[in-house]
């Protein structure tokens, strides 16, 4: 069974994804760099979790599971 992501990670990821939809791709490494540029997150762990969730959102949007 997986872990549930914390609310502030989901909220931050959704805000970034809604605000800058063209800056994110299915590539985690690219998304990680974009999160670093667009936010002031200092923790590497939090940055990676946000980037991972954004990667998941991009994949779900491409598959038509979210609008």
From Swiss-Prot:
Q: What family is this protein classified in? A: Belongs to the eukaryotic ribosomal protein eS17 family.
Q: Which organism is it from?
A: Thermococcus gammatolerans (strain DSM 15229 / JCM 11827 / EJ3)
Give any Gene Ontology cellular component. ribonucleoprotein complex
What is the designated name of this protein? Small ribosomal subunit protein eS17
- Has the keyword GTP-binding been applied to this entry? no
Q: Which UniProt keywords apply?
A: Ribonucleoprotein, Ribosomal protein
- Is Ribonucleoprotein among the key words of this record? yes
Per its UniProt entry, which superkingdom is the organism in? Archaea
Q: Which gene encodes it?
A: rps17e
One Gene Ontology term of the molecular function aspect:
structural constituent of ribosome
Alphabetical GO biological process terms: translation
């Amino acid at each position: 069974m997986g872990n549930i992501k914390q609310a502030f990670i989901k909220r931050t990821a959704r805000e970034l994804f809604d605000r800058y939809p063209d800056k994110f791709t299915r590539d985690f490494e690219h998304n990680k760099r974009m999160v670093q540029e667009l936010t002031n997150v200092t923790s590497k762990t939090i940055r990676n979790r946000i980037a991972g969730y954004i990667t998941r959102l991009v994949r779900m949007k491409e598959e038509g599971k979210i609008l």
